Amino acid sequence: MLDSTTLFADACRFIPGGVNSPVRAFRGVGGTPVFVDRAEGPYVYGVDGKAYIDYVGSWGPMILGHAHPEVLTAVHAAVDRGLSYGAPTVAETAMAKTVCALMPSLDRVRMVSSGTEATMSAIRLARGYTGRDKIVKFEGCYHGHSDSLLVKAGSGALTLGAPSSPGVPANLAEHTLVLPYNDAAAVRDVFARHGAEIACIIVEPVAGNMNCVPPVPGFLETLRDVCDASGAVLIFDEVMTGFRVALGGAQAHYGICPDLTTLGKVIGGGMPVGAFGGRLDIMEQLAPVGQVYQAGTLSGNPVAMAAGLKTLELISQPKFFDELAEKTRHLAEGLRVRAEQAGIPLCVNWVGGMFGLFFTEQQGVSRFDQVMACDQERFRRFFHGMLEEGVYLAPSAFEAGFVSAAHDYQILDRTLTAAERVFAGL
């Protein structure tokens, strides 16, 4: 029988760290990563045949659950017509129309193949549109692995960026200003001093890469205000939150209109897709209409468009997001109550179909320093306890969890019963 330990050792001989994305290696929790053989509905199945209730959902895209039959049918039909053409298709226009209709802040949208491509291109576009170089990002927000965004935060209200990954030139990082997430005063201060030099703010409207941290009241509004006053471009990175926290994304949920939006994950229905779009006057700076260059061999891939279009059609059904949010609330509140009953300090954040678990005495977690102060060792033990119980959570204390339409209340209650047993041993 195949086992994950043997397969991981073999993978490490040919793939750096044995994985194609670092978080999958279980470095944040220890142990050997689970090698998955297949997935269906709310479950992933290891190579040993064990079923796990899955709250990773391929890191967000699988909002309908795995292997949804209607999505698979759409994909099969597209595959029968060919895998890639390198030419315009009806499907990519249909996707653009659908996305623009669901997100009114988008007058035009360009398809790419990953979230990193989307954020990288949006920043280049903002710089080209404004003629400015500096960008603002926030501690704990991840926007892909392009050089401008691999910059760590230091202390104080403003950090002139230092590279946090070898290979990022220091002079490039100096154009990235890093501020504390949810700190409106720091935003106003940096714009008072550098507003005329700043091309854009890029922000996860719900920070999903330091677990799940929603914006505090007034924070997103401040970003909109300072961009309006300075002429900077406001970019919402909705690669994770787009079509996940609400049908119109976090911008619809919170009622804030960005200038540009980046998308991914859900819009691909499990296939590699990204997108960026926004105001007409900005988007028309893109080649071939304008001078800001962006291109991609597989952008708008017809198979990926088929998966994404069917997914967007299904999640647009009435009450879909109301029901998803209620399921997430049921899980989040159930975990909090059971932890409290076991004497375990746990803060649970959730928005739409996202949730985050923080082992901390703090009543609310809204800042990066609070996230970093949480008990990571207790999370590690909780993760492995749940894995033994057949529940697959994100293998990192800094990643959000996801609920899908396939998670019915019986599945959620099985998860809560498992958590009750694990909490008792923590």
From Swiss-Prot:
Subcellular location field: Cytoplasm
Pathway named in the protein's UniProt entry: Porphyrin-containing compound metabolism; protoporphyrin-IX biosynthesis; 5-aminolevulinate from L-glutamyl-tRNA(Glu): step 2/2
GO biological process entries: protoporphyrinogen IX biosynthetic process
Entries under PROSITE patterns matching the protein: AA_TRANSFER_CLASS_3 (PS00600)
InterPro entries attached to this UniProt entry: 4pyrrol_synth_GluAld_NH2Trfase (IPR004639), Aminotrans_3 (IPR005814), Aminotrans_3_PPA_site (IPR049704), PyrdxlP-dep_Trfase (IPR015424), PyrdxlP-dep_Trfase_major (IPR015421), PyrdxlP-dep_Trfase_small (IPR015422)
Cofactor: pyridoxal 5'-phosphate
GO molecular function list: glutamate-1-semialdehyde 2,1-aminomutase activity; pyridoxal phosphate binding; transaminase activity
Source taxon at top rank: Bacteria
A Gene Ontology cellular-component term: cytoplasm
Keywords in alphabetical order: Cytoplasm, Isomerase, Porphyrin biosynthesis, Pyridoxal phosphate
Modified residues (N6-(pyridoxal phosphate)lysine): 265
Enzyme kind, highest EC tier: isomerase
Catalytic activity: (S)-4-amino-5-oxopentanoate = 5-aminolevulinate
EC annotation from Swiss-Prot or TrEMBL: 5.4.3.8
Family: Belongs to the class-III pyridoxal-phosphate-dependent aminotransferase family. HemL subfamily.
Oligomer and partners: Homodimer.
Classification via HAMAP family: HemL_aminotrans_3
Protein name: Glutamate-1-semialdehyde 2,1-aminomutase
Native species: Methylococcus capsulatus (strain ATCC 33009 / NCIMB 11132 / Bath)
Gene name in the database record: hemL
